[in-house]
C-alpha cells in the first residue's frame, strides 16, 4: 500500500547551549546552514511528499534561507515547546498520512538509515536509536545513586515515524495530562503504544554544544566524499 509520508522539522528552538549569537539551526557548516543540510536530506527522498518546518513566529532568520522557498516545503509557526511545535505542524497534515519528525539540528542523517525507518509498517511507529555503549549512572544531583543495566537502554534519535492521526491524538492526551513530552515516542508511550527501535548510526548526532560543530562538519565531509 502506498503511504503519504510527510516530514516535520521543528526549528523554533533558540539553542542557548550553543552560546552563539543566533539559533543553532542557522549556524553554517560547509557554507550552508545546519537547517539547509537537514532539509536537503528530505527534499532528495522520492517517497517524502512534503516537508513542514515549524519556526518561531518572531524568527528573523528563516526568510533568509532560500531553500525554504521550495514548493515542497510549508512553514508553520512553532509553539511554546518542541512538542507544541510538532503539534502545530500536524495541523496542516492529513490524518491518513504518516509523519517523520526530525530534529533541525541533526544534519548528518544517512539516507540508508532513513530508508530503514521508512520500511516500517506498524501503527505503533518506530524511531531510529542507538544501543547504549557507555556505563550509565543514575544520579542524585552530582552524586551517583547506582549503575543502570545498559543492556536495555537505547539513545533515542530522529527521525521518529508514526501515523499522523495516532501521533496527534497522543500529543493531545499528553497535553491534557500535563505530561512532559521530550520526543514523539514518549507521547506514544504515554498512550500505551510501544514504538519499534530501529538501530541507526551514531554519527546522526544532534548539534547541541559548540564542540559538536567540528564533529558534524567532519561527518558531513565524509558523507560528501563517500556519497553515503
Swiss-Prot record:
Set out the biological process GO terms recorded for this chain's protein. isopentenyl diphosphate biosynthetic process, methylerythritol 4-phosphate pathway
Can you tell me where the transmembrane regions are? none
Stated name of the protein:
2-C-methyl-D-erythritol 4-phosphate cytidylyltransferase
Give the UniProt family note.
Belongs to the IspD/TarI cytidylyltransferase family. IspD subfamily.
Q: Could you tell me which pathway this protein works in?
A: Isoprenoid biosynthesis; isopentenyl diphosphate biosynthesis via DXP pathway; isopentenyl diphosphate from 1-deoxy-D-xylulose 5-phosphate: step 2/6
Instruction: Give residue numbers for the site Positions MEP for the nucleophilic attack.
Output: 150, 206
The EC designation for this entry is 2.7.7.60
> InterPro entries attached here?
IspD, IspD/TarI, IspD/TarI_cytidylyltransf_bact, ISPD_synthase_CS, Nucleotide-diphossugar_trans
**Could you tell me what this protein does?**
Catalyzes the formation of 4-diphosphocytidyl-2-C-methyl-D-erythritol from CTP and 2-C-methyl-D-erythritol 4-phosphate (MEP).
Q: Which PANTHER family match?
A: 2-C-METHYL-D-ERYTHRITOL 4-PHOSPHATE CYTIDYLYLTRANSFERASE, CHLOROPLASTIC (PTHR32125:SF4)
The reaction(s) catalysed by this protein are: 2-C-methyl-D-erythritol 4-phosphate + CTP + H(+) = 4-CDP-2-C-methyl-D-erythritol + diphosphate
Tell whether Lipid biosynthesis is among the UniProt keywords: no
Q: Which NCBIfam families match?
A: ispD
Q: Which domain of life is it from?
A: Bacteria
The encoding gene is: ispD
Annotated site (Transition state stabilizer): 17, 24
Q: Does the keyword Transferase apply?
A: yes
Care to name a GO molecular-function term for this sequence? 2-C-methyl-D-erythritol 4-phosphate cytidylyltransferase activity
Enumerate the UniProt keywords alphabetically: Isoprene biosynthesis, Nucleotidyltransferase, Transferase
